[in-house]
Amino acid sequence: MVPSERGDVATAIRPAAADKLVHGPISDKKCRKKVPRKVHKSEREKLKRGHLNDLFGELGNMLEADRQSNGKACILTDTTRILRDLLSQVKSLRQENSTLQNESNYVTMERNELQDENGALRSEISDLQNELRMRATGSPGWGHGATGSPLPVPPSPGTVFPSQQPMQPSPMTTSTVFPLQQPLPQPTVIEPSARQPLELKLFLEAPPAEDPEPSEDQEAPNNVARPQPRYPTEASSWPISLGLPRMEDEQM
């Protein structure tokens, strides 16, 4: 019987404790907090729409100030088109940048090679200059002879070498000149490259030989022999039979 009474008491106590636990702290919290100002959802939506409209207006003015239609759809299509163009330009610029970087690297390599070659050439030039100075100091006559010796003067085109002078004929020789007679070979002379061309004389011009006029005092040489008579002799008129024995008698 005791446990049943205890159960009834517990059931009797529980609703009162539950009321204290439930209503006590909730009522305290409500009293402590201030009631906030309520903003309607429609007002918040209006504020958002106004802010978006301002942003679209600024974007439209940045893209095209004198636009016929300021609709949001037109502004969005224009912005997407411009963004695509900008992206394509960025891509092409990146490719150009890569090619230019490769070319710049190649140019720097060539410049370094040219600088090395230039240094090598300068060293060779300095070595050659030192060698020339040593030779000039070692043999002074060599340097003066190389610089002070006059260059050979080329002869004028009208000059005639001794070997090319025509031979004057003697008074006893005839004055005939053969047309096929060639001049004697010319001596080889080393001349600079700026020499004037010499005229090649194929035929020797001989002065006309004047026949010496015989003087009256001098007589012409009498070398002409008298002609022999060609009349038939007595022996030629003889017959052959008579002539042979006579020839044999003469031989005896």
From Swiss-Prot:
Molecular function as annotated in GO: DNA binding; protein dimerization activity
The bHLH domain extends over: 36-86
Q: Any idea which UniProt keywords this protein has? A: Coiled coil, DNA-binding, Nucleus, Stress response, Transcription, Transcription regulation
Q: Which SUPFAM superfamilies match?
A: HLH, helix-loop-helix DNA-binding domain
The segments labelled Disordered in the record are: 135-252
Q: Where is the composition biased (Low complexity)?
A: 162-176
Quick one: a GO cellular component term? nucleus
**What name goes with this protein?**
Protein IRON-RELATED TRANSCRIPTION FACTOR 3
Basic motif: region residues: 36-49
Q: Where in the cell is it found?
A: Nucleus
Name what induces it. Answer: Strongly induced by iron deficiency, both in roots and shoots.
User: Where in the sequence does UniProt note compositional bias of the Acidic residues kind?
Assistant: 208-219
What function does the entry list?
Answer: Transcription factor that acts as a negative regulator of the iron deficiency response. Suppresses the induction of iron deficiency responsive genes, such as NAS1, NAS2, IRO2, IRT1, YSL15, and NRAMP1.
Q: Which residues form a coiled coil?
A: 76-131
What InterPro entries does the entry give?
A: bHLH_dom (IPR011598), HLH_DNA-bd_sf (IPR036638)
Q: Which family does it belong to?
A: Belongs to the bHLH protein family.
For region Helix-loop-helix motif, the annotated ranges are 50-86
Misc note: Plants overexpressing IRO3 are hypersensitive to iron deficiency.
